[in-house]
Each structure stands twice: as structure tokens, then as C-alpha cells.
């Protein structure tokens, strides 16, 4: 382990990102989000009033100084590719800066899809080697967080690690969805289990487990050796969490990086913010949290902006309807191009070009772009997918049985409405 002085850290914070390439794994479907990902990959799902989920990983790279990025795509990639081409074409090729889109290469006979997260990188190794990076930062494209990857790179170098895994404590009941690790006093990973049925607790806190965040830093040459060996292993599932990280752990080459050391937040005393918005409830809750008085995630930090594709839209408008009712909103995010006419919107998130007609009550709802809500509707605890037309007088979120019959209703009572669901409902009503 190397002890670094403050000046050395400042210098490395500038140099290490320039020697690195980031690979964002963005091919996942996100089946737990149900119909919300039927026509788009999970990283392309809308979030926070104007963003896509992948914007967080991309913005973290940009703000950390990593300007060489590969985005590995697969499932329903058109929306994702279109978003990146329109919103992330800011890099300078002359300065060797880029965002490369890397689809499945289908280099294996009979294989059309990536066999696992490690195989997604393996299939693109010929391209990745051409980047001539010393370090490879591997990221999930479907998490909401702000992190300075340069700090993680410094930690990787300081510990003399060949592989570094970002980690944070999670409630033990949620740890079954993550890789869970045990570490020694120097943060060396001494045990790693992917998605255990009975997660081991952290020493000193029986209520939590130490979970992998799916964020890795590798020495590039070491990664290439690992992937070459894994590719030849017929018994492998070719996955970082299931195969690669456990193997490195057995070899004593993996170290943990506590997320609080590199988490970017305005309040240093606050809990580090990282969300896997993989379920409908988690997605709904994370969106609505941004509309609270003091959100856990600060989206107004000018020192660490989250970038996205910006459309040229007029400002949001709140108008009085012909009956004299005023358009009002409270504790909500309302994006450009929205019109609220004689209705009340409370604790909700409205994406661009949403139209709320008169006499509506919108409470704790997430309305994706171009949603049109007819007069006299009541929407509560729901997510309305893009371009849905909600008929006049429709009530959503008040009758559990009716919601479950017409739409998708989660166990927690969050209702998802899509255009296809509305179309089927209309067909039934016309019979």
C-alpha cells in the first residue's frame, strides 16, 4: 500500500482519469420495471423530470475528467442510442475524447446476445484495447448517484490493487439483490458472494450487509488476462459478480472502495445517495424524492451538474380555465412545455410537454413526456408512461381492485399505466 501526500493526490486526480477508459454496461432490460421497459432499455428510462437514467453515469464520467467512454448496448437500444447521439456529442475527437456505442459483436456462433456482464466487455475487447488505457472503469448504466471516479482511481493506485470494487452498506433484507462482500482491516476483499439467499451481516451491524455497487476499477492488462481466461471457461456464466470478482477475491487481488470516500454531495454529513431504481416502487419513490423540500439527491449542485439532451421548449405554464379555476402546483417538478389548466398538482413529477386539463387532481404521480390528461381526472400514486392519453374522468390510484384489473399494480400499491394498457381497456369498453 502506497501513502500519498496531498499534492500527489491532486496531481493523480488530474492524471488518472486521462489514463482511463470508462465502460458503461447499458444493455439491461430491467424486467422488474415491468412494462416501462418493454420498448426501451432500463438505462434509457426517463428520470427526474428531464433526464435519462444513463445520464448519471455519463455525467459522473464527464465531471470526473474521464473523456473516453464506451457504452455497451444490447436490449431495445434505439432510444438509448438516439439519446446519446443527440445529447452527448460534446467530446472533441481531436483531443481523443469520445463516447463510443458498442453493440453486441455476435462473434460467437449461435450467440446473438451477451452471455453475461463480463462477456459484454470480452466481445468488445478488440475495440477496447485500441483505447490504450492503463485503467478500465466499469460502470452500471442504470443507477442514480453522483460519484467522483478520480477519487476511486486514486484509492485503487494507493492500495496497489489490481481490481477495486465500490461498496456501501445496505439493509440486510435488500442484500439478496447484490453481491455481498467481507473485507479485512485494509479493505482487501476476503469473501464475495453474488446475490446470496442469506446475506452475511457486517461486523458490528447485524442489520446491514456490505454490498457491491457494480462499479469496478481494473488495471487494464489484468482485466484483459482475466477475460481471456474466463472466455475459455465453459463452466463460467461470464459475469463479473458471479465469476470474475469471486475469482479475484480467491487470488487476493481485489480491494473494496467505500462509496462515502468518492460520493459527491452538498452536505458532507448526509447519507451517501445511491439508488438502484430497479423496481416500480423504487423508481416512483426516487422520482418523487426530488420534488421534496430537501431532496436527498442535490440536482442543483453547479459544481457537479447532471447533463442531458435538451430540447427547445417553452416554459411551463399554469393557467386559469374558463370557469375561473387556477392551475396550481405544490412540491412538484414541472418541466418545460407543460401546461396545467385549472388543476392541482401536488408532490408529483411532470416531464416535458405534459398537458393537464381542467378540474384534475394529480397527487404523488410521475407523468412521463407528452402525457395528456383529460378533464376531471384524479391520479394518485402512479407512473404514467410516455404519450399516454388519460380519458376524461378517469380515476387511478384510489381503487386497488379496479387498478389491478385495468393496469399493473405493484404489491406496494404503485400503478403503472402504458399506452398498450389503455388501448386494451378501450377495446374492452367498446365490446
Swiss-Prot record:
SUPFAM superfamilies tied to this protein: Nucleotide-diphospho-sugar transferases, Trimeric LpxA-like enzymes
Protein residues bound to beta-D-fructose 1,6-bisphosphate: 39, 419-423, 429-431
Domain of life: Bacteria
Enzyme Commission code(s) on record: 2.7.7.27
Gene3D superfamilies noted in UniProt: Hexapeptide repeat proteins (2.160.10.10), Spore Coat Polysaccharide Biosynthesis Protein SpsA, Chain A (3.90.550.10)
InterPro entries reported for this sequence: ADP-Glc_PPase, ADP_Glu_pyroP_CS, GlgC_bac, GlmU/GlgC-like_hexapep, NTP_transferase_dom, Nucleotide-diphossugar_trans, Trimer_LpxA-like_sf
GO BP, sorted A to Z: glycogen biosynthetic process
Subunit structure: Homotetramer.
Record bears the keyword Repeat: no
A Pfam family it matches: NTP_transferase
HAMAP family: GlgC
Alphabetized GO MF terms: ATP binding; glucose-1-phosphate adenylyltransferase activity
CDD domains assigned: ADP_Glucose_PP (cd02508), LbH_G1P_AT_C (cd04651)
Record: residues binding AMP: 40, 46, 52, 370, 386
Keywords from the UniProt entry: Allosteric enzyme, ATP-binding, Carbohydrate metabolism, Glycogen biosynthesis, Glycogen metabolism, Nucleotide-binding, Nucleotidyltransferase, Transferase
Protein name as catalogued: Glucose-1-phosphate adenylyltransferase
Sites marked Could play a key role in the communication between the regulatory and the substrate sites: 74, 113
Coiled-coil region(s): none
Notes on how activity is controlled: Allosterically activated by fructose-1,6-bisphosphate (F16BP) and inhibited by AMP.
Chemical reaction(s) catalysed: alpha-D-glucose 1-phosphate + ATP + H(+) = ADP-alpha-D-glucose + diphosphate
Its job: Involved in the biosynthesis of ADP-glucose, a building block required for the elongation reactions to produce glycogen. Catalyzes the reaction between ATP and alpha-D-glucose 1-phosphate (G1P) to produce pyrophosphate and ADP-Glc.
